[in-house]
């Protein structure tokens, strides 16, 4: 597995990154529709595994890669998992799949292969789809939204074979 990038994340779009004992705290700009994020200082291509161990204080633990987004504790319905396709930005809503307990650590794994992707949270497969992700290059990031704050203990990008 690639080294933990937690100490190298760059604040983006008004994001504030604060060191805490167990990692970092990421707070947004407190402006609605501004997607503040802690951005990795590298561009990656599929196939990859994007892994975050993080928590939210309320809503919106979000992972970003290109046009794709994984949203846990979505502000409109905390129980609905939201997944936006990295190639097409098509939005998928999965009722009953998106809630994580607040102020507790959760492992979020977003595997993006050349022809498919899947989202696994705390060891449970929550979403899987087909797609052509071979030509995408982008920097992964993690962030809060709409007033939430998140904490991140681990941020890893691993090439998949």
Model-derived features: where do they sit?
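Flexible glycan-contacting loops in extracellular carbohydrate-active proteins
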Residues: 126-156
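Low-complexity, Ser/Thr/Pro/Gly-rich disordered linker/stalk regions
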Residues: 1-45, 116
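Beta-strand signatures of extracellular beta-sandwich domains
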Residues: 62-64, 118-120, 156
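Short tryptophan-centered beta-strand motifs in secreted/extracellular beta-sheet-rich domains
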Residues: 50-52, 103-121
